[in-house]
């Protein structure tokens, strides 16, 4: 087969241009990324050797080998893992399908240090090698194939693939280093980077180098060169080590390598269980949210091992989805080595490990919450996703409620339900909350006025997830939750109903509202729960459905709602006496527009609103 030339996808070209010209603040991470990829390839081969009958007789010692040539300015990374075939090369090294490149590009901030830290997190680590290499040659042979392939590119828009000769399965990557980056072809440079980032990769990393020493003395002294191959990492599964042997730095270094994250984690939980079940877990709570946390196709941050043998890193059942920001390892002594994904989903051992792990993680979050000043470092990135647990994790619902924080009518900061509960007024029967699209609109809601008169605080919930989960939350500490917009809640305020005399007094004016706004609203009602506001747009059933649809990612169709009027307001009292139909119509529309502004913060037809306002002002002056 002759060389076949391919063109990188557009996004890959953009990425390569960034790698080569912009993201150079921490170039050494390229080696961390290539070693991590090699480790993944070894993990995958180990798993296949357990599950694929054709490969069970394969006898290999998994390892990663590094070598360099300082004269030729080359650096080579070699593994004997699963390898790639031609299609894998095109898919993984030429297209966006597996790389997360589009998400990476959209997440760039312009800060070179921060942006370079994103490289591994977004699965685009291979391309980081172009920060230091003018050309890359990949030779690879898939374990299930007889034919090996070579991939060659200078990172300038194209790559070539051809057949090649390679006896052993696995992948060998050779970097032709740029002049200014030739220092990476050095024993001590490579050794230092591996010890910094890859000390606890669970496979041995060997470095081949030429050792120079002198023998003899005086005129008989001569230089002797000897090729050596040393293991330069511990190759120890850090999670299997005793906690007493490990320092805080060990945990943090492992996290940065494992999670491809240059920042330090907020916290970690290392736990070893012995007894009827034996397993070890090491979980990390990151300091920033994974880029794909709110995507349906988010990648699990937890790897499952059985007796140190990698099983999967793509099982979203290892932890509940509301803890998908957690990174870490579960290593079981009791699961069968050839466990399939289908068996995993029904396995009682794993279910027990999962249940205990969730409790451990929530307990750690509870520990973080004891320091409210620092708790925001956790809650700001992860509070929204934590709320999802209220919908499905009934076993831990009470614990989750303790961990959640909310804005409220009376407080300028996030508060806990415990704090709200401690400040209940003497006759207050419920915990009140109000759902809306954003915090500013909620704070301005006329619905809050009567609660304020009673001295009742109201939780203001503007996250989309709130509308999805709150209807399923019945109580906290024996105090029921109530939506502040619902009629049931308003009854608890002890409001008097509008009497027939007032209804009769406003009958003609309400008819005028209905005639003018017949295409906009489904009806007009007099309300006893408004104080300073003239009008309010309300419809509790439609509001619940709209919030639910937003949470499900669906567009919310326009629907007619009820316009509630405050019969005690001076403006409405004056409108009762307005006999100019044209002017009355203008007033009605202005009041409706005002109510829409309070509801949405914007108007669909701002031009007409402005014309009506000008007309009324002109007549008033």
Swiss-Prot record:
Annotated compartments: Cytoplasm
Xref: InterPro entries: HATPase_C_sf, Heat_shock_protein_90_CS, HSP90_C, Hsp90_fam, Hsp90_N, Ribosomal_Su5_D2-typ_SF
SUPFAM superfamilies linked: ATPase domain of HSP90 chaperone/DNA topoisomerase II/histidine kinase, HSP90 C-terminal domain, Ribosomal protein S5 domain 2-like
GO-annotated molecular function: ATP binding; ATP hydrolysis activity; ATP-dependent protein folding chaperone; unfolded protein binding
Region annotated C, chain positions: 548-621
A Pfam match: HSP90
SMART domains, per the entry: HATPase_c
Annotated stretches, region: B: 342-547
Keywords: ATP-binding, Chaperone, Cytoplasm, Nucleotide-binding, Stress response
Region (A): 1-341
GO cellular component labels: cytoplasm
Major subcellular site: cytoplasm
Function: Molecular chaperone. Has ATPase activity.
PANTHER family linked to this entry: HEAT SHOCK PROTEIN 90 FAMILY MEMBER
Assembly behavior: Homodimer.
Similarity remark: Belongs to the heat shock protein 90 family.
Protein's UniProt name: Chaperone protein HtpG
């Amino acid at each position: 087969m002759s060389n076949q030339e391919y063109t990188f996808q557009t996004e890959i070209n953009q990425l390569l241009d960034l790698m080569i010209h912009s993201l150079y603040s921490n170039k050494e991470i390229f080696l961390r990324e290539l070693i991590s990829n090699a480790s993944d390839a070894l993990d995958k081969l180990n798993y296949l050797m357990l599950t694929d009958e054709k490969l069970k007789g394969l006898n290999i010692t998994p390892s990663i080998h590094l070598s360099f040539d300082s004269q030729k300015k080359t650096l080579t990374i070699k593994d004997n893992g699963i390898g790639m075939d031609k299609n894998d090369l095109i898919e993984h090294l030429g297209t966006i399908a597996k790389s997360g490149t589009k998400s990476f590009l959209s997440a760039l901030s312009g800060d070179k240090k921060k942006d370079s830290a994103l490289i591994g997190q977004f699965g685009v680590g291979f391309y980081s090698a172009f920060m230091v290499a003018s050309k890359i040659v990949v030779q690879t042979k898939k374990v299930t194939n007889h034919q090996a392939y070579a991939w060659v590119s200078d990172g300038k828009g194209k790559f070539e693939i051809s057949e090649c000769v390679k006896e052993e399965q696995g992948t060998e990557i050779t970097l032709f280093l740029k002049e200014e980056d030739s220092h990476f072809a050095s024993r001590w440079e490579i050794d230092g980077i591996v010890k910094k980032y890859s000390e606890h990769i669970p496979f041995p990393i060997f470095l081949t180098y030429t050792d120079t020493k002198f023998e003899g003395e005086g005129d008989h002294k001569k230089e002797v060169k000897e090729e050596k191959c040393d293991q330069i990492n511990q190759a120890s599964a850090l999670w299997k080590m005793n906690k007493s042997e490990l320092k805080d730095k060990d945990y943090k270094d492992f996290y940065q390598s494992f999670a491809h994250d240059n920042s330090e984690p907020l916290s970690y939980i290392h736990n070893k269980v012995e007894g009827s079940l034996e397993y070890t877990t090491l979980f990390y709570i990151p300091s920033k949210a994974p880029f794909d946390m709110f995507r349906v196709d988010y990648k699990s941050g937890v790897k499952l091992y059985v007796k140190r043998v990698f099983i999967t890193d793509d099982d979203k059942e290892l932890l509940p989805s509301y803890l998908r920001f957690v990174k870490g390892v579960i290593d079981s002594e009791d699961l069968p080595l050839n466990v399939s994904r289908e068996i995993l989903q029904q396995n009682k051992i794993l279910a027990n490990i999962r249940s205990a792990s969730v409790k451990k993680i929530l307990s750690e979050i509870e520990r973080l919450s004891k320091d409210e000043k620092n708790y925001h470092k956790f809650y700001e990135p992860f509070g929204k996703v934590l709320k999802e647990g209220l919908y499905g994790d009934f076993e831990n619902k009470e614990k989750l409620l303790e961990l959640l924080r909310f804005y409220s009518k009376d407080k300028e900061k996030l508060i806990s339900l415990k704090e709200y509960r401690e400040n209940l007024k003497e006759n207050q029967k419920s915990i009140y909350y109000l759902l809306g699209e954003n915090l500013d609109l909620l704070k301005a809601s006329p619905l809050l006025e009567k609660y304020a008169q009673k001295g009742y605080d109201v939780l203001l919930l503007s996250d989309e997830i709130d509308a999805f989960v709150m209807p399923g939350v019945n109580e906290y500490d024996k105090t029921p939750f109530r939506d502040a917009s619902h009629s049931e809640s308003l009854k608890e305020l002890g409001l008097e109903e509008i009497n027939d005399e007032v209804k009769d007094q406003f009958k003609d004016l309400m008819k005028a509202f209905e005639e003018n706004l017949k295409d906009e609203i489904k009806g007009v009602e007099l309300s006893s729960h408004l104080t300073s506001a003239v009008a309010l747009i309300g419809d509790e059933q439609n509001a619940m459905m709209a919030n639910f649809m937003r949470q499900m990612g669906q567009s919310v169709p326009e629907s007619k709602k009820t316009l509630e009027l405050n019969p005690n307001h001076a403006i409405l009292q004056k409108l009762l006496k307005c006999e100019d139909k044209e002017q009355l119509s203008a007033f009605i529309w202005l009041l409706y527009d005002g109510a829409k502004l309070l509801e949405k913060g914007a108007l669909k037809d701002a031009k007409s609103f402005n014309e009506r306002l000008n007309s009324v002002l002109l007549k008033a002056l």
